Design a protein with these regions (language model features):
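N-terminal cap/lid segment of alpha/beta-hydrolase-fold proteins
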Residues: 1-24
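Alpha/beta-hydrolase
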Residues: 149-233, 240-243
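Conserved alpha/beta-hydrolase "acid-adjacent" motif
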Residues: 251-257
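Catalytic histidine-centered segment of alpha/beta-hydrolase-like enzymes
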Residues: 278-289
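Alpha/beta-hydrolase active-site loop
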Residues: 81-100
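Glycine-rich "HGGG/HGxG" loop immediately N-terminal to the catalytic nucleophile
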Residues: 40, 67-83, 280
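Conserved strand-to-loop "acid loop" that flanks and positions the catalytic carboxylate
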Residues: 243-249
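Short, surface-exposed "cap/lid" segments of acyl-processing enzymes
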Residues: 24-60
Length: 301
């Protein structure tokens, strides 16, 4: 199994790509970051078995390309001030262009990167798309939920970077939200050591913290409010395969959000899966194998 990394030049920066591949694989998946973390924090995560989720996929016939878009993880350089889903998709399409040819290529987004694989699927860059904890809205939803949009706008300015850390993640998201919803932490015993290992090499890592573009986090509301589209013609998804997953106890992405995503793209060939016994962070929790198996089955079908 080959586990190298490389950079793809894009505008005034370099996109970091970490790949996990195996000889003879004819399928690939390009995995995107979450709100602030590298895709590696989710998929190149070893739950204590000695093998990461990405390595499981590679051993099953699926090469895995985990991409740090500009402003994330180990990427380098300057990002555009207006960091939106089209700019993000342009970066990923550049990575796809430089990849080896495969019989089937899928894209996987998580929560805040929901729109990006869908944009690329509509544009014809991908053969299928996977989104874990889908978070996507239209203009009507944004206008009907002013309190929510104001809360998000208050959480991030329109430019620059915001800083976070493992301590903030534990305090603000895990302890207060995910863990309280399910009653007790479900994370595997190796979680903290694995997360420390995966984040300490970030280009922006400093004193146990890292940064991510603020503008990108707001794309979920600024794009539909200013463009009145999802970033593509929904008709271009006709019959195309999409998998939406959600943790059974995912309080951060309610079931109604998944249902709404299915309604938006009802013309596509959509599959859904609820990951039993997990929260928003299923890949870190004891129920991780069901999540990995579901994604693997979809990518191989």
């Amino acid at each position: 199994m080959v586990i190298p990394h490389y950079y793809v030049p894009f505008e005034s920066g370099n996109i970091y790509v970490h790949r996990v591949t195996a000889p003879g694989n004819s399928r690939a998946v390009v995995v995107l970051p979450g709100r602030s973390m590298s895709a590696r924090n989710f998929w190149h995560f070893d739950p204590g078995t000695g093998i990461t989720h990405a390595e499981q996929l590679a051993e099953s016939g699926i090469d895995v390309y985990m991409v740090d878009a500009l402003g994330f993880g180990d990427s380098t350089g300057v990002v555009r001030a207006n960091y939106n889903r089209i700019y993000f998709a342009e970066q990923i399409s550049t990575v796809l262009y430089h990849m080896p040819r495969y019989e089937h290529v899928s894209g996987l987004g998580f929560c805040n990167t929901t729109a990006v694989p869908l944009v690329l699927l509509a544009q014809g860059w991908l053969d299928s798309a996977v989104v874990m904890s889908p978070t996507i809205f239209d203009t009507q939803w944004c206008q009907s939920n002013p309190a929510m949009t104001r809360l998000w706008q208050k959480s991030a300015t329109e430019s620059g970077y915001w800083s976070t850390s493992l301590d903030k993640l534990i305090e603000q998201q895990l302890n207060k939200i995910s863990d309280s919803e399910i009653g007790a932490p479900q994370r595997v015993a190796t979680w903290h050591s694995e997360m420390s290992r995966l984040t300490q090499d970030y280009t922006s890592y400093n004193l146990a913290s890292w940064t991510a573009p603020r503008t990108w986090w707001l794309d979920r509301i600024t794009w539909p409010m200013t463009h009145h589209t999802h970033g593509f013609d929904v008709a271009d998804l006709n019959g195309k395969r999409i998998l939406f997953t959600r943790g059974e106890h995912d309080v951060e992405v309610p079931e109604s959000w998944l249902d709404r995503a299915c309604e938006y793209f009802a013309n596509a060939n959509i599959e859904t899966y609820t990951i039993p016994g997990t929260t928003h962070f299923a890949l870190w929790e004891r129920g991780y194998q069901a999540a990995v198996d579901c994604v693997r089955k979809f990518l191989l079908s």
